[in-house]
Amino acid sequence: MTAVLVYFDKGEKAQTQLLLEALKEAAHNRCDGVRVLNGYALADTDRLNMYEYIVVFCAEKPLFTSKPDSAVVTILKEHGLKEGCKGCVLTVSRGLFSDKFTRNVMNALESCGFMIDYFDTLRNAADARRAGANIG
């Protein structure tokens, strides 16, 4: 199974890179290939619907809010996220309302027809390895 891990992090923080490496390493057990893409830097030729599994990783979360950036859903729709695509949603635990933030991201993506089979809130690399083992 081919999978794509689309992450959203404007700051390109070191913690995000650490979590991405742990996710990718653990996902290789169930997936033939995992491609990592920065959601904010997707090219016009990057199409998500060619992958069997799509991981949406929101690595940035405002400290005091539970609303996801509306640009995330818009970017994913523009690059081929359509009804029937299967995948999971991962977010980073930061500040207040982290679980509600995850639910709001899931609701926004499910309204597009994205079928979510797994979700998690990551706190550290161990959480990322556990979540990566469930990709696919």
Q: Which stretches of residues belong to each language-model region?
A:
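FMN-binding flavodoxin-like domain, especially the glycine-rich phosphate-binding loop
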Residues: T2-G136
